[in-house]
Curated annotation (Swiss-Prot):
Keyword Heme attributed: no
Recorded GO MF terms: 3'-5' DNA helicase activity; 3'-5' exonuclease activity; ATP binding; ATP hydrolysis activity; double-stranded DNA binding
Chain positions recorded as ATP binding sites: A33, A34, A35, G36, S37, G38, K39, T40
Species the sequence originates in: Bacillus mycoides (strain KBAB4)
EC number(s) given by UniProt: 3.1.-.-, 5.6.2.4
Pfam families noted in UniProt: PDDEXK_1, UvrD-helicase, UvrD_C
Protein name: ATP-dependent helicase/nuclease subunit A
Cofactor(s) the protein requires to work: Mg(2+)
Listed GO biological process terms: double-strand break repair via homologous recombination
Keywords: ATP-binding, DNA damage, DNA repair, DNA-binding, Exonuclease, Helicase, Hydrolase, Isomerase, Nuclease, Nucleotide-binding
Membrane-spanning ranges: none
Protein family membership: Belongs to the helicase family. AddA subfamily.
Signal peptide: none
Length: 1241
């Protein structure tokens, strides 16, 4: 129980709260772990402590650990495995720890879906499902849904007496299609599956529209909207109070005070009615009458103050007017009539959803496939049964799991949904006060509501649990951040203390939620957080809204490029924890975070123009790639050659190679009919002499096309694709174009996608093309195949969602002026987990439509949830930075925006007014008003502290706030008219007259010789091994670079693979063993065998490599004098990688190029030992020596010294440069014969 917690050890690295999270038990525990607070380390330590404790240790397979991703589950297993191995070192005889290591692989450490799969596999006989089922591909799932839905609607259209269905169709479809109705059915199906009992949720949705015998006060929508009415009236009241304050200033329009006070009285009456009922507000709204403002002579008063007073009063009147128009222009009973009228239609809609769900499940069952929601619901079906009162209760299987699991630990709990919560509930104990559920997460980082994650589950427990755990569950706050500098944390806290609250934001950013400094950094320069606001003037914007967006992306990209280049060129210093020192910033240290990726291509282009290497994992552009587009058109033509546009595209492409004139000639042969019919007719006749070339091209293609069409009917799609690649030569052709490897990779991806498609339940080319269309309709373009890896030294661009869990020294958060995506709020129908279904009232006979109460309530609720989600997304973005945070946004009229943001300066509390926070349309609407209350904004505003409380104005954060003129970032228009004419002449292949002033320049360029020709035949980066070979070669390095380009050696055929490992593979295996051998244990055959087995288990060695290792030779080394020195050394480092700069003359014997040139050398040192009198370098060799030299080892020794002298000299030089200590001895150790060779200079 709680009283028996172990005390935190002396000198422990854990904070008090972390230790509490590690050892607390006896009830359900919720750990609210802030960004960078070490939650994974805490979770692993808790598991380890449970496994290794002396009293009642728990077997690892009696713990259920639920992670958010498979990668996180694997990392968790690895960490636990490493921790157990460390424990085993201290107590090698512990059978319990050995048992845990053997149980680890089958322990329940996985995603919730993997756990569901485990339950279903074990109890499939309780379900109507084939035990050999497979997980459905997402696109395959969508196509199946489409098929099922088409069949259902076709049946409904065929029923004669089906008036309610046709009423539904009339209301929710257009003249052209019933796509909207299909979308409604699919959306309701998806939303229902996010609930433990989908049918029950659907039934409640219909019940909400059954208003027989009810008043408007009984409707949940009305009660919710009344709260919103109060909110808007409070906002209006604040505007009038502020206007009154301004009017009463010495230079304010005092005559208007009387009118403003009457306004306050009117708003007070409305607010009083809102505290009553809907009807009372309706009646009060009918009597609203605003007094006319008294005329004043504006010159007698401060004109700006008068404008401000009038503006605030107009805002207040607009708030009331909006309420009148949206909610109180109709009598309450008319809203009830809407519900009555829509009830039978909605009932029919829900019936269709239920039929669809039943049929869809049946077809998946027939095809032996399930999707991820099926996994959750099937698992829940096994774990639950219905009680007498109709509620769900644990089944016998669930009780078995309860007995099995000593504790259930859930990572990223804030991203759990209702179904997953039910599954977890059924395998854990009933009562929170005696529970065994341990949950870790941060609701401030819950950013997956679009995946139906429910942050309310976390929030409910956080509010309910106490820090003492009295009477229920316990909550523990981990607020210390071990990732970021003080400036990043203080800057983030300063913003979120002002914008995140329970009413707007769903959680209070209080003292417990604030980020607290846990990391230590050396003093740094220029580490203040920054806000750069770009002013985009109207003149700079072209092509309307779309042009403005492109312009914003370009402006922000240029500003970021300037900053990145400046920071890299100046050697801006960042802290490197590995070396515990400051180092110059590299491109890999930068990340650019975006809310979504539409701007990414423009930003990439701008950065590349500035010479900045950049990488973005774009999920778009694949099907737009020219080579993919052409191939897709080929397949469309194979499927149906009567399609003119695809066929014309193929004929015009390099595959056939017709030019515009030839295409026109072909069309002229038949003005009617399709291109294909014209082509067929043209090929049947005898061509004119001038048309012979055209005839030959078309004949070649026509024969291929007929062959492909026949092949497509009989063979697999993937074989067809490869056949087309080969017979057209197009795959080889694109390989010769610029970015050829990328293009070929794209074509291979298309082939792979066809293979994936063929693994589904669909077949054939037509279905494949439909499959691809569905991908594009869903917006799931795949992105081009990767040509640049994520580990390169490049600036990364990614979405904020992708960055979650990552950290970077320098973070740019861009696009902060882009509007929030509110498209979901504009749909014809809305769905909500609590409020169900809402849509416009549509009367097709009268041709009228208007907003309903349910639609207004759901829209308001979804808007507030969207605002809360966007706050959490911003929090994730800001907390990725370790050392430097730079925020960038663009506005069209900075002065106008600043005037709006300055409203916040008058507010006297930390949390900004609700209407400012709820009315935000972009991130800048939160960030700028917050920063305008900080002293560091004075560099921009020069307004003084005013009424801002000192604790806010003087808050310890450091900020730089700057407005950047967009016109200063735009490059001048390129190129003079003369140059343009020259380019056009060259493009048209016309002779260019050479004027005398250009003559010398042209000749110089034509006769130019590259000044570093020798460098082209020598690599700028070499490995030590390559340099060694260069010195051994009689030819030196002449043409060595060209030799590297020879065709790669093919993989050994399978019939040769059985003959064992190559010498190189054996050597690699021995080096791996020497790297991992535990020097603290006695080096015996048993210990080495156990170690090799562990390495095989971890996939560090293959079984074949393990069998080939001569253990006795490893033992011989440690029995030798040199091996004993290794065991006795002060410190031992193995497999030490290094890079260093070396002069080209040292690296290449034949270097004739410029003196002073350097090359980058890289290598790995096998072993270095530090003894009392210095450092010794050891290189292990597996060369075969015995029997190869007639004179034995004495004859071999000079040859071996000569062979490896250069290599070890370079190793020694690298060590001496990095360690600043001389290497006293360089040794070669040969396992064959147990020989040691000392290398002398």
């Amino acid at each position: 129980m709680i009283e028996n917690w172990p005390q935190k050890p002396e000198g422990s690295q854990w904070t008090d709260d972390q230790w509490k999270a590690v050892v607390a038990n006896g009830r359900d525990i919720l750990v609210a772990a802030a960004a960078g607070s070490g939650k994974t380390a805490v979770l692993v330590e808790r598991i380890i402590k449970k496994i290794i404790r002396e009293e009642n240790p728990v077997d690892v397979d009696r713990l259920l650990v639920v992670t958010f991703t498979n990668a996180a589950a694997q990392e968790m297993k690895n960490r636990i495995g490493e921790a157990l191995e460390k424990v085993l070192i201290d107590g090698p005889g512990s059978q319990h720890i050995r048992k845990q290591l053997s149980l680890l692989n089958k322990a329940s450490i996985s995603t919730i879906h993997s756990f569901c799969l485990q339950v279903i596999r074990g109890y499939y006989y309780m379900l109507d499902v084939d035990p050999r089922f497979r997980i459905a591909n997402q696109t395959e799932n969508e196509l199946l849904k489409e098929e099922v839905l088409d069949d259902i609607l076709e049946e409904e259209y065929g029923i004669e007496d089906n008036s309610i269905f046709f009423e539904l169709v009339d209301r929710y479809t257009s003249d052209r299609s019933d796509d909207d109705l299909q979308r409604m059915i699919l959306a309701l199906h998806t939303e229902s599956r996010a609930h433990p009992n989908p049918e029950k949720w659907l039934d409640k949705l219909v019940e909400a529209y059954d208003v027989e015998g009810k008043t408007i006060e009984d409707l949940v929508y009305a009660s919710y909207l009344l709260e919103d009415v109060k909110f808007q009236l409070e906002t209006a009241e604040k505007h009038i109070r502020k206007a009154t304050e301004l009017a009463m200033l010495p230079d304010g329009p005092a005559p208007r005070v009387e009118t403003l006070q009457a306004d306050l009285a009117l708003l007070g009456t409305l607010s009083s009615a809102a505290r009553g009922s809907w009807t009372s507000v309706y009646e009060a709204m009918q009597n609203v009458s605003w007094q006319t403002l008294k005329r004043i002579k504006k010159s007698d008063y401060n004109e700006d103050v008068v404008k401000r007073v009038d503006s605030l009063r107009n805002k207040a009147k607009d708030e009331v007017k909006k309420l009148q128009e949206e909610l109180f222009s109709r009598r309450p009973e008319s809203f009830l009539r809407d519900f009555q009228d829509m009830h039978p239609v909605l009932e029919k809609l829900v019936k269709l959803v239920k039929v669809f769900t039943e049929r869809f499940q049946a077809i998946k069952r027939d095809k032996g496939m399930v999707d991820f929601t099926d996994l959750e619901h099937f698992c829940l079906q096994i774990l639950s049964e219905q009680s007498e009162d109709g509620e769900m209760k644990p089944s016998a299987v669930a009780l078995q799991y309860r007995n099995k699991f000593a504790e259930v630990l859930v990572d990223e709990y804030q991203d759990t949904n209702f179904v997953q919560e039910s599954i977890i509930k059924f395998v854990t104990k009933d009562f929170e006060s005696e529970g065994n559920l341990f949950m870790v997460g941060d609701v401030k980082q819950s950013i997956y509501r679009f995946r139906l994650a429910e942050p309310g589950l976390f929030l409910g427990k956080y509010k309910r649990f106490t820090q003492e755990g009295s009477g229920g569950g316990m909550k523990i706050d981990l607020a210390k951040n071990f990732r970021s500098r003080h400036e990043v944390l203080a800057g983030t806290n300063f913003i979120f203390k002002q914008i995140m609250g329970e009413e707007v934001g769903e959680i209070d950013y209080d003292a417990d939620a604030e980020l607290k400094l846990g990391a230590s950094y050396p003093e740094g320069e220029d580490v203040a957080a920054e806000l750069l606001c770009i002013q985009q003037t109207e003149e700079e914007v072209q092509d309307g809204e779309e042009g403005a967006e492109v312009e914003k992306a370009q402006l922000e990209a240029r500003l970021m490029a300037q900053r990145i280049k400046a920071m890299v060129d100046s050697g801006y210093a960042v802290y490197d924890r590995k070396t515990d020192s400051m180092r110059p910033v590299q491109y890999r240290d930068f990340v650019i975070l975006l809310r979504s990726m539409p701007w990414a291509p423009q930003i990439m282009e701008e950065l590349k123009l500035q010479g900045i290497p950049v990488y973005a994992d774009l999920a778009t552009g694949y099907f737009e790639a020219t080579e993919v587009n052409i191939m897709m058109n080929v397949f469309r033509v194979i499927d149906n050659p009567m399609q003119d546009i695809p066929l014309a595209a193929v004929l015009r492409s390099p595959i056939v190679g017709l030019n515009d004139e030839e295409l026109a000639t072909l069309r002229a042969h038949g003005k009617k009919g399709s291109f294909y019919e014209v082509m067929s007719s043209f090929l049947k006749g005898a061509p004119l002499e001038e048309e012979q070339e055209l005839h030959d091209k078309l004949e070649w293609f026509y024969k291929l096309l007929q062959g492909w069409r026949e092949f497509a009917r009989q063979q697999s799609l993937s074989d067809l694709i490869w056949k087309v690649y080969g017979e057209t030569g197009y795959y080889d052709f694109v390989g010769g174009l610029p970015a050829g490897k990328q293009r070929q990779a794209n074509l291979r991806v298309l082939y792979d996608r066809a293979r994936q498609y063929e693994a589904t339940s669909f077949r054939g080319l037509f279905r494949f093309l439909r499959f691809i269309e569905r991908i594009l309709e869903r917006g799931d373009d795949m992105g081009t195949a990767r040509a640049l890896g994520e580990q390169e030294d490049v600036v990364r661009i990614m979405t904020i969602h992708k960055s979650k869990g990552l950290e970077f020294p320098v973070v740019f958060v861009a696009g902060l002026g882009r509007r929030f995506n509110t498209q979901d709020l504009m749909k014809r129908f809305l769905l909500h987990k609590d409020f169900g279904f809402g849509s416009q009232f549509i009367d097709p006979r009268k041709r009228i439509k208007y907003t309903t109460l349910s639609q207004l309530a759901i829209k308001r609720k979804m808007k507030m949830e969207l605002i809360a989600e966007e706050m959490r997304v911003l929090y994730v973005a800001l907390t990725r930075a370790k050392e430097k945070l730079i925020l960038i946004g663009t506005v069209k009229d900075a002065n106008k925006e600043m005037e709006k943001w300055l409203d916040a300066r008058e507010h006297s509390e930390w949390l900004l007014p609700d209407h400012i926070r709820a009315g935000a349309s972009c991130y800048l609407d939160w960030i700028a008003p917050s920063l305008y209350r900080h002293r560091d904004s004075e560099m921009l505003l020069e307004l003084g502290q005013g009424n801002i409380p000192g604790e806010i104005y003087e808050y310890s954060a450091s900020w730089k706030v700057e407005v950047v003129e967009g016109k200063d970032l735009l490059a001048p228009e390129p190129v003079q008219e003369e140059k343009q004419e020259l380019l056009e002449a060259l493009r048209d292949k016309k002779a260019v007259p050479l004027e005398s002033e250009r003559k010398e320049e042209v000749y110089d360029r034509l006769m130019w010789k590259y000044g570093y020709e020798d460098a082209t035949s020598h690599r700028a980066k070499q490995s030590v091994t390559e340099i060694k070979r260069n010195y051994q070669s009689e030819e030196g390095s002449d043409n060595a670079f060209i030799k590297k380009l020879r065709a790669p050696i093919k993989t050994r055929p399978r019939f040769m693979e059985k003959k064992g490992l190559t010498y190189a593979e054996r050597g690699t295996a021995v080096h791996a063993v020497m790297q991992h051998v535990d020097l603290k244990k006695p080096i015996t055959i048993e210990v080495l065998q156990e170690q090799i087995a562990r390495m095989v288990n971890k996939e560090l060695l293959t079984f074949e490599q393990a069998e080939e290792i001569a253990i006795e030779k490893v033992i011989s080394f440690f029995d030798s004098d040199l091996g004993k020195r290794v065991l006795a050394a002060k410190s031992v480092e193995r497999e030490v990688p290094f890079t260093m700069m070396l002069s080209a003359e040292e690296a290449y014997q034949d270097w004739q190029g410029k003196k002073g040139e350097s090359i980058l050398v890289q290598g790995v040192i096998d072993c270095m030992i530090e003894e009392e009198d210095g450092i010794t370098l050891i290189d292990f060799k597996t060369d075969t020596i015995e029997g190869k030299f007639p004179g034995g080892f004495d004859q071999a020794k000079p040859t071996l010294e000569d062979r490896y002298k250069v290599q070890l000299s370079l190793y020694a030089k690298a060590l001496e440069k990095s360690l600043k200590h001389p290497v006293k001895e360089k040794c070669l150790y040969f396992f064959d014969g147990n020989h040691v060779v000392n290398i002398e200079e």
